Design a protein with these regions (language model features):
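Catalytic-core segments of hydrolase enzymes
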Residues: 1-32, 89-93, 110
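Secreted peptidase-domain scaffold signal
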Residues: 3, 105-177
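Hydrophobic alpha-helical scaffolding
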Residues: 8, 12-16, 54-62, 74-78, ...
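Hydrolase catalytic cores
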Residues: 26-105
């Protein structure tokens, strides 16, 4: 239905990272499900009585993103996890309203709606997880926090910038976060 679900999580995280990183179709997704499953029995109104069931949630959106990643790796099997993330983020499209403004804040849509074709054929590199070293973080040497902050009025901003993140959407896609 091309709308952000009312139950979608929003960011930033406690550690100041923008979440979600991307969004994908996950509402009212028609999928295969047997008639004898607990969900089908508990909610027959969503089951067609045959092989299909309508569901919504991150479990549905995760399948869409996973499918795109599988296509990316089939096309370019040498991609590292950071390169996959970079291409997935940089190829996503922000939701824009009829007046050319963001339909949702970047704390609601991240880099935007995933685009399978653009992600598979992207050649973008070096834009995900810059400077993050998980080994140092786990060893307690260096801890990483995002730049998102909440002010005393409840507004989210990005540390070091004079404007709100959702007014400067390019910051996300150009990997300055």
């Amino acid at each position: 239905d091309d709308r952000l679900a009312s139950f979608s999580s929003t960011g930033p995280t406690v550690e100041g990272f923008v979440k979600p990183e991307v969004v994908a179709p996950g509402g009212h997704v028609l999928g295969l499900m047997g008639t004898n499953t607990t969900i089908a029995i508990t909610h027959p109104e969503y089951h067609d009585g045959g092989a299909y069931f309508t569901m919504s949630g991150t479990s549905q959106a995760a399948g869409v993103v996973t499918g795109i990643v599988a296509l990316m790796l089939q096309h370019s099997p040498w991609l590292t996890p950071d390169e996959v993330k970079c291409r997935l983020l940089s190829s996503s499209q922000l939701a824009i309203d009829g007046e050319g403004n963001l339909a949702y804040s970047l704390f609601q849509q991240g880099a935007g709606l995933v685009d399978a074709y653009a992600a598979v054929y992207s050649e973008t590199t070096g834009c995900a997880n810059q400077g993050l070293d998980v080994a140092k973080d786990l060893a307690g040497i260096e801890h990483y926090c995002g730049r998102a902050r909440r002010d005393e009025y409840g507004n989210y901003t990005i540390e070091g910038l004079d404007t709100f993140l959702w007014n400067d959407a390019f910051l996300w896609n150009d990997a300055f976060l």
